[in-house]
Amino acid sequence: EHVVVNALDSPKTKETIKIAFSISQAFSSSKLTLVEEISASKVAVQVDDDLTLKKATLKKERLTKEEKNRVEDVVKNLPKEIQGDITWKTQSIFGKRGYSIGHYAKVVRADLLIMNSKEKYSFINRLFAKDLEHILAEIPTDVLIVKNKKNG
């Protein structure tokens, strides 16, 4: 069993990761992957030559390291009994939120994809597809959506 969970920078993520570890233990999952989706716009560097290519690569590496450290801090602060003996890793992916993690779950043949519930949106924001809409438009695997009552 392979469980993939979104670990995006959100107030809901800590609880989602905690639940992902609990579910992984319940299913005796052999693997848990915490995926940080990084928007391509954060690396918005036009590559015209070797110098700008190097700049874009360094920026991606820095963002990947920052996200990995953030997620590792969340896991370190979980009680040891929740972590159990689950083998987990982090994976940074660049692209459109929702679509990227859905595609990743499909490629790695995840048995379960765990996502945060939607953030509250204004009327204008509802006109544009959000991460869950991308996932639900083409469901790559079983999906569990965690709704955290404290944060929405």
Where are the regions that the model predicts?
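Charged docking surfaces used in two-component/phosphorelay signaling
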Residues: S92-S100
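A short acidic, amphipathic alpha-helical/loop segment
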Residues: I19, H103-Y104
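Amphipathic coiled-coil/heptad-repeat helices and related helical stalk/stem segments
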Residues: T16-I17, R97-G98, F128
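A conditional alpha-helix N-cap/helix-loop micro-motif detector
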Residues: T13, F94-G95, N125
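Small/aliphatic-rich secondary-structure junction motif
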Residues: H2-K60, K76, K80-Q83, T87, ...
